[in-house]
Curated annotation (Swiss-Prot):
PANTHER family attached to this UniProt entry: NUCLEOTIDE-SUGAR TRANSMEMBRANE TRANSPORTER (PTHR10231)
Name under which the protein is recorded: CMP-sialic acid transporter 1
GO terms, molecular function: pyrimidine nucleotide-sugar transmembrane transporter activity; sialic acid transmembrane transporter activity
Lineage, broadest ranks: Eukaryota, Viridiplantae, Streptophyta, Embryophyta, Tracheophyta
Annotated organism of origin: Oryza sativa subsp. japonica (Rice)
Broad class of the protein's primary localization: Golgi
Amino acid sequence: MQWYLVAALLTVLTSSQGILTTLSQSNGKYKYDYATIPFLAELFKLSFSSFFLWKECQSSSPPRMTKEWRSIRLYLVPSVIYLIHNNVQFATLTYVDPSTYQIMGNLKIVTTGILFRLVLKRKLSNLQWMAVVLLAVGTTTSQVKGCGDAPCDSLFSAPFQGYMLGILSACLSALAGVYTEYLMKKNNDSLYWQNVQLYTFGVIFNMGWLIYGDFKAGFERGPWWQRLFNGYSITTWMVVFNLGSTGLLVSWLMKYSDNIVKVYSTSMAMLLTMVLSVYLFNVRATLQLFLGIVICIISLQMYFMPVNMLVELPQALPVTSK
């Protein structure tokens, strides 16, 4: 399977996440416990990967699997990073408004490029660096409100701690992605075996988070397993399937492509979500959205198009004698 097909599918699925989540609400509220969604998504990814790993083991050429604990324990790290990241997200939102947080989140585009260079020793050309920065500028432009919609200085009115936590959140998100790519490419183990290790820890950590939530609430709603499917509808299950499928596609890209492709996919998905929201939820289209889309398309061409196509001048037409 070509990486650009996986990237395109990831863009479509990621763009539909927010839309499906909104459609799963009833009168603006969730009838289900939304903390169960990540747990079931991790369980779906683990079940899917386990099945195909079993199929590989039944074949005439068994897959390569590194089973030493010193290798397996490395797959614990992404779950720890994401757990810290989720808590930093909540802490950040106590200091800044959601729009400011979303704009600061675009820092992860640039920090991914930096960690891509420092951790994975992958060098980007000057043109590619410019493209990555343009992508961050484009996504930020699409999210900035006009002065008529909100105070123009609202972006810079949050406490200093909010900006520091926002930067930390972006760095943690980039670190989790780059570290996962490092795990996927450090050996030639089967992708499904690597997924099984990754998602086993994901299931354990999400289960632990549900148990922690029960203790924090004093078990007033009962244990989490008794309300696991309460309020679930077809749309809710579509959210679970969507979240699980995007995770599987991301792990494929981490194994056979790289983090920058994933960053472009998710950034384009965000813009696609905005465009679809204009038609589905009567959200007003803005000049900033249009400009952001144009900038991101230019960035996409700059990063992936062969250099000779970007700089090649058209051939002069031959002079014909009369």
